[in-house]
Amino acid sequence: MAEAFKFELVSPERLLVSEQVESVVIPGAEGEMTVMAHHAPVMTTIKPGVVTVKTASGGEERYVVFGGFADIVPAGCTLLAESAVAVKDVDRADLARRIQEAKEDAADAKDDQARSKAEQFLSQLTTLEGAILPA
């Protein structure tokens, strides 16, 4: 059994998780990363994706996050999300709205840099949609 550490997932609305966990997989901007006890100190940005939490009791919980930051230290990990919700509580209409807004942002972009950023965000959202919603 892996050693537990403190994990907190915080959104502007509320504290979603504050407990001892075995591991957390977070969608870092440079790729997914697994955090465990005694992890080297890191601060990273979070892209839209799924956070998978393996609890100290052996269960698994999944949360959708829409950007933010993760502060990782040897004793724990705090993820400050721009928006977060449990996968089981995902609102399909809200996700569809976010995807539509991202499509409009890409179409309305004034320059190549803005278009590229909007298209990247749209790609992340559609990948997220495929990962959490059944066909």
Swiss-Prot record:
Pfam families: ATP-synt_DE_N. Belongs to the ATPase epsilon chain family. It is found in: Cell inner membrane. It is a peripheral membrane protein. The gene is atpC. It comes from the Bacteria. Keywords: ATP synthesis, Cell inner membrane, Cell membrane, CF(1), Hydrogen ion transport, Ion transport, Membrane, Transport. F-type ATPases have 2 components, CF(1) - the catalytic core - and CF(0) - the membrane proton channel. CF(1) has five subunits: alpha(3), beta(3), gamma(1), delta(1), epsilon(1). CF(0) has three main subunits: a, b and c. GO terms for cellular component: plasma membrane; proton-transporting ATP synthase complex. It comes from Mesorhizobium japonicum (strain LMG 29417 / CECT 9101 / MAFF 303099) (Mesorhizobium loti (strain MAFF 303099)). Produces ATP from ADP in the presence of a proton gradient across the membrane. GO terms for molecular function: ATP binding; proton-transporting ATP synthase activity, rotational mechanism. This is ATP synthase epsilon chain. The keyword Ion transport applies.
